[in-house]
From Swiss-Prot:
One of its GO terms (molecular function) is hydrolase activity. This is Salicylate decarboxylase. One of its GO terms (cellular component) is cytosol. It is an enzyme of class 4 (lyase). Belongs to the metallo-dependent hydrolases superfamily. Optimum pH is 5.5 for decarboxylase activity. The keyword Lyase applies. Keywords: Decarboxylase, Lyase. Reversibly catalyzes the regioselective carboxylation of phenol to form salicylic acid. Involved in a pathway for the degradation of salicylate via phenol. Also catalyzes the decarboxylation of beta-resorcylic acid (2,4-dihydroxybenzoic acid) into resorcinol (1,3-dihydroxybenzene), gamma-resorcylic acid (2,6-dihydroxybenzoic acid) into resorcinol, 2,3-dihydroxybenzoic acid into catechol (1,2-dihydroxybenzene), and 4-aminosalicylic acid into 3-aminophenol. One of its GO terms (biological process) is secondary metabolic process. It comes from the Eukaryota.
Length: 350
């Protein structure tokens, strides 16, 4: 398929190449690191050539993980996020028909995060924000700032007012959490377990704490076909309905006003990033609808040729899985065009 839109694609500032290499040792195989470093530090290098070769018409770039969420000092974090945004804006300036960007944000303070998001959308033309799970603060990043509490309503209102999506992306564990949880099970860091554990806790916290009830027009994107949540749709809702909601009501606590699937069908989109499983895609489409699914690769953690090869080489099987050619094209391109209000781009009408 030509003109695919891919929207979970990472970069890092070249000045932090050494730190990037250190963090890559957590979950990038030794024989894959040279390619990884070349791509993550050069968003407009051979990745554009690979996009041409494999039918990606438009790429939305975002800062790599943990990005600003790993900066524990507020002032330094805000400076780094702004530098990331200015850098990627400059990098893609000559490729506006091929590339866009998500804002990197310091999430130490909701008001400042709102201001930087507004700057990025209104002045730099960015398409939303991507944040790498919780914001770390304090010694060794021991304080985890979640965005599911009422003090973050000012930020969510900004997202709604700007009418842009918020991508909640995973981050690697570090500090005492890394030592306590993963020192003896380091090969579960990243896609096998740790990424999904963090994001699923966070987005479910947003649901049960009423964020989407207070902001019914809020748009949130989850990668990797839902961070393990879809497989537990029934069990989560079963427990919400028969235990959690009655408990919350008896205690006078806030709780989600609607069934779990309501939020996944009205507020949340899922991407195929790093989860190139036709069977899992079919399951997600059956539960949330093809209109809630967006193609993505997750480069440079995943290979562009692998992600695109799955979608293109298995087109017939995927069409059967998702409900036909229209749904196939919607997932590959047209859902993203609608969500991000994209104009014409390379192969956008192919």
């Amino acid at each position: 398929m030509r003109g695919k839109v891919s929207l979970e694609e990472a970069f890092e500032l070249p000045k932090f190449a050494a730190q990037t290499k250190e963090k890559a040792e957590l979950y990038i195989a030794p024989n894959n690191r040279d390619r990884y470093f070349e791509e993550i530090l050069n968003p407009c290098g051979n990745r554009l050539e690979l996009s041409n070769k494999h039918g990606i018409g438009y790429t939305i770039y975002s800062i790599y993980s943990p990005g600003p969420q790993g900066w524990t000092e507020r002032a330094e974090c805000e400076e780094y996020a702004r530098e990331c945004n200015d850098y990627i804006s400059g990098e893609i300036a000559n490729h506006k028909d091929r590339m866009g960007a998500f804002a990197a944000l310091s999430m130490h303070d909701p008001k400042q995060a709102s201001e930087e998001l507004t700057r990025c959308v209104k002045e730099l033309g960015f398409l939303g924000a991507l944040v790498n799970d919780v914001q770390h603060a304090g010694p060794e990043g021991e304080t985890h700032i979640f965005y599911d509490q009422p003090e973050w309503d000012i930020f969510w209102q900004t997202c709604v007012d700007l009418d842009v999506p918020f991508y909640l992306h995973p981050e690697p564990p570090f500090g005492s959490y890394l030592r306590n949880q993963y020192e003896g099970r380091k090969y579960l860091i990243g896609p096998p377990v740790s990424f999904a554990n963090g994001v699923s806790l966070h987005v479910l916290g947003m649901i049960v704490n009423g964020v989407f009830d207070r902001f019914p027009k809020l748009k949130v994107i989850l990668g990797h076909l839902g961070e393990h949540i879809p497989g537990d749709f029934w069990r989560i809702e079963h427990w919400f309905e028969h235990c959690s909601r009655p408990l919350a009501k008896s205690r006078g606590d806030v709780f989600a006003e609607k069934p779990l699937l309501h939020y996944f069908r009205n507020n949340i989109w899922l991407t195929t990033s790093g989860n190139f499983s036709t069977e899992t895609l079919k399951f997600c489409v059956e539960h949330v609808g093809a209109e809630r699914i967006l193609f993505s690769v997750d480069s440079p953690y995943e290979h562009i040729d692998v992600g695109c090869g799955w979608y293109d080489d298995n087109a017939k099987a995927i069409m059967e899985a998702v409900g036909g050619e229209k749904a196939y094209k919607d997932i590959g391109r047209d859902n993203a065009k609608k969500l991000f209000k994209l104009g014409k781009f390379y192969d956008s009408e192919a």
